[in-house]
């Protein structure tokens, strides 16, 4: 299907239900799908979503609550250090998770290809939280966050925003929740989101390697 036809179909797709189903997750298809605002959520079959409205966060608009300031520099930050361990932790920390073995295998492949990235938090060399997602152009497509220690996921988002601020990024948070709203995220229409992707996914990120943003 041509890009223009897919764009038109997505504008009229269901707002709060899957747009379509697939039997398997394929790394190459995921990269293409993300540029059209689609993301997988649950497997067997894989459900593909493009919700309307869409929750996004501008790194320059991150809200840092007063009670968070004491946590910001409490943990060591590492980038792309142990992606596999972080995504596994995101799965294991939840009693019910869409992140199954197929998700882990596929997203780890995307990591080895340079698309998927992780920001990890450590305390005494122990992984205690973080966030992972895909970077395409100037968009960070957030997939999942986790915290083992108090406020670790919030610190991860704050640190991610700090790193991406100089590069005019937008962070895709997928679906609204109060936790994200407190941090400065907000909803926009699907049409506005897809227009942002048209522009930003075709731009250079502005840096060579994500992991080198922390020296």
From Swiss-Prot:
Gene Ontology molecular function, alphabetical: leucyl-tRNA--protein transferase activity
EC class (word): transferase
Keyword Transport assigned: no
GO BP: any one term: protein catabolic process
Signal peptide annotation: none
Gene Ontology CC terms: cytoplasm
Assigned EC number: 2.3.2.6
Top-rank taxon, per record: Bacteria
Main subcellular location: cytoplasm
Catalytic activity: N-terminal L-lysyl-[protein] + L-leucyl-tRNA(Leu) = N-terminal L-leucyl-L-lysyl-[protein] + tRNA(Leu) + H(+); N-terminal L-arginyl-[protein] + L-leucyl-tRNA(Leu) = N-terminal L-leucyl-L-arginyl-[protein] + tRNA(Leu) + H(+); L-phenylalanyl-tRNA(Phe) + an N-terminal L-alpha-aminoacyl-[protein] = an N-terminal L-phenylalanyl-L-alpha-aminoacyl-[protein] + tRNA(Phe)
Protein family according to the UniProt entry: Belongs to the L/F-transferase family.
The protein's role, per its UniProt record: Functions in the N-end rule pathway of protein degradation where it conjugates Leu, Phe and, less efficiently, Met from aminoacyl-tRNAs to the N-termini of proteins containing an N-terminal arginine or lysine.
HAMAP family according to UniProt: Leu_Phe_trans (MF_00688)
Protein name, entry field: Leucyl/phenylalanyl-tRNA--protein transferase
Lineage: Bacteria, Pseudomonadati, Campylobacterota, Epsilonproteobacteria, Campylobacterales
Gene that specifies this protein: aat
């Amino acid at each position: 299907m041509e890009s223009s036809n897919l764009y038109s179909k997505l504008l009229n797709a269901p707002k709060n239900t899957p747009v379509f189903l697939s039997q398997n997750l394929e790394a190459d298809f995921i990269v293409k799908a993300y540029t059209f605002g689609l993301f997988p959520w649950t497997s067997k079959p894989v459900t593909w979503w493009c919700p309307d409205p869409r929750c996004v966060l501008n790194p320059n608009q991150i809200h840092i609550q007063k009670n968070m300031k004491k946590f910001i520099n409490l943990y060591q930050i590492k980038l792309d250090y142990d992606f596999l361990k972080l995504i596994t932790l995101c799965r294991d920390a939840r009693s019910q998770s869409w992140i199954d073995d197929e998700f882990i295998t596929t997203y780890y492949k995307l990591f080895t290809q340079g698309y998927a990235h992780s920001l990890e938090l450590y305390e005494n060399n122990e992984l205690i939280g973080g966030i992972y997602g895909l970077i395409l152009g100037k968009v960070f497509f957030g997939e999942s966050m986790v915290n083992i220690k108090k406020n670790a996921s919030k610190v991860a988002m704050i640190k991610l925003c700090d790193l991406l601020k100089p590069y005019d990024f937008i962070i895709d948070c997928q679906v609204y929740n109060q936790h994200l709203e407190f941090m400065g995220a907000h909803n926009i229409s699907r049409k506005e989101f897809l227009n942002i992707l048209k522009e930003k996914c075709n731009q250079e990120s502005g840096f060579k390697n994500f992991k080198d943003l922390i020296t």
